[in-house]
Structures are given as structure tokens and as C-alpha cells.
Amino acid sequence: MDDLLGYLLLPATLLGITAIAAMGLQLILGGAGLLTLGHSAFFALGGYASAAWVIYVAVPAGLTQPQLLLASGLLIGMGTAALAATVVAWPCLRLRGDYLAAATLACGQIAETCANNLDSVGGASGFTQIPRLCGLPSVALCAVVVAAGLWRLYGTGLGQAVLCARDDELVAQCYGINPARARLAAFVIGSTVTGLAGALSAHAFEFISPTAAGFQRSVELLLAVVVGGMDSLLGSCLGATLLILLPELLRFVPGPAAVVLDWAVALGLPAGVAQVALAALQNSVFLFALVVLLLLRRQPGGLVALWPAQRRRASA
């Protein structure tokens, strides 16, 4: 039983962290309608800044309480991500569509390059020996707080301004809304939440590397939001769940598949076809992509469209 709990602890913690980062991106992508391909930069900034603060400042200054170290580290990580998002947003948010996506992608590549070349934070080998200050309970608590906070934000004047600016800038201006400021606020808040996820990741897994700022991480977060449903915070959490748990489940496919294909060969299936099928089923990336494509083909609105309340709302 202990082995099972230990096996589930890592993916559960990773799921919570990914859900937090995805909810931050949902505010930007689904709420403000801004396509960003470099969002992982803020995840990495939050993690690196928090770890550097704890190792190089807080501990040498005599701060030893784990709770205070974690709280201060999370605040530093979030603050760094917020500051970076503000600096990035002023030039980038003047762009639209593909140009904005390309600009944010460049920011992500810059962050990854800087992390690779800074020896003080481990360089290409990654930042190691980070104190483990949090685990699943802390991550779960932060995920609940973030979900409640963002849900409440959508009900405020700022949240409504963000949605109105996304839907129609002219109408937003008629209501006295400044679309640029609304988008800026959404971008900074969403990036700050993602910075929190990065800080939690660094202190939960005691490690962070430049790949945290890489394009693959940005695509994973984007995939979680799109697959789950861009218009819903719940969708982001469901997408993060699929993103983390599906690869774990697909690891158990090749064994039974090999037995079934052996039976099929005995019944007359050509051996070459069986070998190709087995090779495909042993490729977890291929299986994951296939499942995602089939899901989006069946449910373009994402996983959240399967939720009973969402289905009743759509049919009303």
C-alpha cells in the first residue's frame, strides 16, 4: 500500500503544479484571447527566482523556518514573474495573432538561453540542491486558492472588462474600458500564477532546469488549456489531469497489446502488420497524440464539454 501511495504521490504533485500553471495560461488565452507560445518562461522565472532567493539570500540571512522560507520564496517567484510579464507585455501586447505568438516564443527562448548560461543557477545542468519545502498538501492548497481566486476574478469588473475586450474592443471602449489595460492586467496576473507554479515545482522536486522555459513546456501548458476547454478554469484542470495521467496509463498498453496481436497473427493477421501495430502501440508519444486528436475531433469544446453542468448549459 505504501508503495502505491509513493507511486501516486509524484504524478499527483505534478498534476497540481500543472493545473496551477494551466489556470494562469487560461486567463491569458481563454480570458483575454491572447495566444502566447513562450509562457513557460514565467514558470521557469518563478522557479529560479524562488530557489535563488532561498539558497543565496534567505538561508544565509538566518531564516530557517521552512514555512517562512516557502512563503518568502513563493512571493519572490511570483513577484519576479509579474515584473517580467509587465516588461514583456508593453511591447508584445501591441501585436496580434501570429506576431504576438512569435514574440512570446522569442521571450521563452531568451529565458531558456539565459538559464543555460548562468553558472550561478547551475547552467545547462540545472539548479540542484534546492531545499524541499513543499509537497502535495501545499500544492493542493495553492491550487484550490488559485482556482477560487481566478473564479472570483472573472466575476469582478476587471474580469468582465477582460472578457469584453476579448469579444469586441469597440464595444469595450463604448463602456469606458481600456482594452490595452485589460489585456495587460490579464497577462500579468496569469503570468504571476504560472510563476507560482514554477516556484512550487522547484521546491517540491528540489530541481529546476532550463528546459522548464523551453518550447515543449509551453506547448504542454497550451495543450492542457485547449484540450480541457479554453473558456473554463475547470477545463484547464481537466486538461492538466489528462496531460499528466494519460502517459502513465499508456505505459500499460504495450503488454496486453502484444498478447492480442499474437492471437491476431495466429488467426491470420500478417506478421509485418502486427509488428508495425506493436511498434506504434509501444510509442507513448504517438498514442498520446492519437488520443488527443480523437478527443478534439469528437469534442472541439474540450473535456469540460463532457461535464454534466456544461452540457446542460449548452443545451439550454
Question: Which ranges hold each PLM region?
Answer:
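Transmembrane alpha-helices and adjacent helix-loop boundaries
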Residues: 1-316
